């Protein structure tokens, strides 16, 4: 686990792919629990350590995850996310050239709880959640394209 920023209120951690942020049905140890142990050891804290999850990244995704170190910080960060005052930007590396240099994609997501997966469809489905994203190609190599992705 790599901590990339820390102050009295929050801590930012570089999440690797295959790690989970919060506990799930798999029983794998989540990053939030690993962080509690790290903080407890680093600061020699007796008793419980507070770590508040402000947002998540899916298991196959790597990136920076922000955690709150106090309940007050968690409340404030949650409010900032709710009001859209925090901007999350994703970068994706893809092999196939996107159809357009920049575009907006609209899909409908259906969650399969038994498989612990979500599926994307081009057309509306019952019980589906509408998902909109905007992407822009920002770099390319001989074989890959780097996209900047913003979820709407």
Task: Go through the PLM ranges and name each one.
Residues 1-152:
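RNA pseudouridine synthases
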